[in-house]
């Protein structure tokens, strides 16, 4: 019996896939089809896959062509599969010609001509593209525009900004003009403008991805989420850390008891990028420390320990009434504590520590760009290290989640509304000087 194996993602299974599978089957007596796992696709930079692994497996199975279906989960698995399953022929589309010649050492390699003019990428791209308008003065806007190039189903309609140094395609003179030419907005304007801009966009039934905080008070945050529901719009916090694979896995391991009961969390995030503006007291258009770094630092605290803390203390070193160069927030829960330290006028090691009764999780600086973390125990021999590919600082994964939410009309679960509201509540208390102590 001649055994044949082939691999693919098989997203949005189409005629071209089926013809290739039929030709593969004709090469032998028994066809094994390897379907790529979601995480494996992400590690290869394939982030636009529309269907889940099980949906793709079911689609391949429904063709009746495959005799056996396996899952491809890691780099180098093809050699393992060929040897383990006794494969005689490995086959793949001709667009990969030469790529798998090294497998000739283990079996015969056959490249099959693909059906011209048909591909999953083209099918995904042909779906109605979301026109994304970008609003704001920070250079992160340029990164977002660049990352849009890697995400199917999205195109940048233009930018509304007062920063003449930002170079993003078409520039609009007014916020309203950008709104009229966009289906959705990415907002990174000054936090004092967020509520007004988000409300105006949602009133016109535009979807919004906004750099947290989405508002400067709990009441405003609740109003925006309620309005989004009423208008059938997606409103998402843009916290890129939440969408990275490594960070998500780290949170799951922490909550799953890998380090025992969690007693303490310490998150630090600082930057001196704006130190020249701060030294000149020219910060009217600059994000302060609590808004720039607070939401990111609150993310793991609230995701792991929840938002129902007993009390908190905000300790700040102020440049003026609205601008903190350093802030420390201490949260006290019934059975745990957490501390965040953020600063734009102070420098510290930007690490994340999660302490439990059995061990601790260590995420090195810059922890908010999570691609690596360690679980450490009393016995170093038990320590575990985890690494996951992170492309585009997590921005492209954030954009994919946003587009998926718009297309599915379902709010994603990366950042809950309770968490979004809790972030705004802490920032409101900072401005109101509630639970507050000022350093001289």
Regions found by a protein language model. Name each.
Residues 241-311:
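Predominantly a Rossmann-like dinucleotide-binding segment in NAD(P)-dependent oxidoreductases
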